[in-house]
């Protein structure tokens, strides 16, 4: 098969204000940053930036803990990192599920040797605090309560 001669040109859409659920407008500052050269995670400049980020996180959380760090990975990797460092075999963990990522938390808890005590809510609804209180009363030996603040699979926020 022979491809027809194509007139390849740059794609330059006209500027718009996006008002739907996504994608959303990106600020000029972010667009400029996205056009910057890519740094690898072992590049000295990247490591320097991560060290500065660590200092800022220590300030925000008012800690001098040397183990403070930002995770240079997707959110799921950060979640798994937390569980792997906090859960010991047999720990009870109250896990709230109202979307995909609550289920992923359950999987992580179980992979780390913990027992997931599930508090299930309808997908797309915030976590029901009364259910969490009931789970805490039924399982006072639970060492962790875990929930997804912004459940991106359903677009719901839980506080």
Kindly give the residue locations of the regions a language model identified.
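Short beta->alpha connector loops at strand-helix junctions that form conserved
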Residues: 97, 119-122
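N-terminal "arm"/small-domain region of PLP-dependent enzymes with the aminotransferase-like
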Residues: 1-43
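Active-site phosphate-binding strand-loop segment of PLP-dependent enzymes
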Residues: 127-159
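Conserved PLP-anchoring active-site segment centered on the Schiff-base-forming lysine
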Residues: 87-103
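Active-site-proximal loop->helix
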Residues: 104-115, 122, 133-135
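Short beta-strand segments
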Residues: 72, 120, 146-149
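Conserved N-terminal alpha-helix of the aminotransferase class I/II PLP-enzyme fold
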Residues: 33-81, 100, 104-110
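Alpha-helix C-terminal capping segments
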Residues: 84-89, 111-112
């Amino acid at each position: 098969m022979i491809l027809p001669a194509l007139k390849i040109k740059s794609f330059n859409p006209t500027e718009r204000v996006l008002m739907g659920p996504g994608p959303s407008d990106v600020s000029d500052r972010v667009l400029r940053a996205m056009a910057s050269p890519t740094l690898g995670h072992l590049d000295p400049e990247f490591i320097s930036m991560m060290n500065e980020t660590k200092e800022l996180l220590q300030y925000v959380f008012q800690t001098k803990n040397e183990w403070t760090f930002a995770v240079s990975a997707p959110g799921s990797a950060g979640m798994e990192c937390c569980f792997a460092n906090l859960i010991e075999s047999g720990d009870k963990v109250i896990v709230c599920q109202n979307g995909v990522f609550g289920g992923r938390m359950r999987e992580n808890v179980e992979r780390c040797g913990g027992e997931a005590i599930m508090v299930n809510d309808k997908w797309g609804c915030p976590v029901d605090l009364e259910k969490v209180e009931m789970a805490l009363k039924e399982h006072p030996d639970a060492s962790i309560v875990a929930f997804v603040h912004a459940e991106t699979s359903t677009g719901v926020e839980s506080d």
